[in-house]
Design a protein with these regions (language model features):
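Cysteine-nucleophile amide-bond enzymes
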Residues: 2-223
Length: 223
């Protein structure tokens, strides 16, 4: 009799746990899937996405540009799936969810040209991707040189829009225009240039693109 009661108790516990899993976990999954579906309904080919990178130089970029965003890329849709064309270790296509997961706290902002429906036609997007493909596989440019030999994230975005759509998203600046006095900034500059800092080098920052009046916010997501 006692053995039967124990078996009955164990069965009851598993039954209750099963009900909890049924009622709570599926709803979480459904909620996540629904949020993802809603996000993808809002995204369009050619949108620009921003995040706070977790890279070693992220804090220096934030200090120098007085912005929380240190990394960006262009969203492409291929075979029904969304990717981010980015300059990270190399220039590559990264699945959107994977790209988002690499940023701080899962936060990201997606922006779009205010007149995207007039400018980003099928042929223009095609040309942008053709121009972008010329950078595929190139190494990340940690020295922020304006040549095409290596390339950094905001430079990739700016050049694709300029050469593919004849649009300048963000104002070009010189390295000397930034705040170079922060501790992290000074350390990175010393590592890369020694005492010969190229202050007259042309630079485009994620902040400059983010703040462009030509763009409007489509999504601002925080976990």
């Amino acid at each position: 009799m006692r053995k039967a009661k124990i078996i009955s108790l164990i069965f009851s516990i598993f039954f209750i746990l099963g009900l909890c899993a049924y009622y709570f976990y599926p709803s979480t999954t459904v909620s996540t899937d629904r949020a993802k579906a809603t996000r993808e309904e809002q995204i369009e080919d050619g949108d620009i996405i921003f995040q706070t990178s977790l890279s070693a130089q992220s804090e220096a970029i934030q200090q120098a540009t007085n912005s929380k965003y240190s990394h960006c890329g262009i969203i492409y849709k291929n075979n029904g799936r969304f990717y981010v064309y980015e300059a990270a270790e190399t220039v590559k296509l990264t699945p959107l969810d994977e790209w988002v997961a690499k940023g701080k706290d899962g936060h990201y902002v997606i922006k779009r040209l205010r007149i995207a429906n007039q400018i980003l036609t099928f042929n223009t997007l095609k040309k942008m991707k053709e121009e972008g493909s010329k950078f595929l596989g190139k190494s990340y440019d940690s020295a922020f040189d304006w040549s095409d030999e290596k390339i950094y994230s905001s430079e990739l975005v700016w050049k694709i829009y300029k050469r593919g759509a004849e649009v300048e998203v963000g104002k070009l600046q010189y390295l000397r225009d930034f705040d170079l006095t922060g501790e992290e900034v000074e350390q990175k500059l010393k590592e890369r240039y020694g005492d010969k800092i190229p202050k007259d080098e042309i630079v485009i920052s994620p902040a400059s693109i983010f703040n462009s009046s030509m763009l409007e916010t489509v999504i601002s997501h925080t976990l």
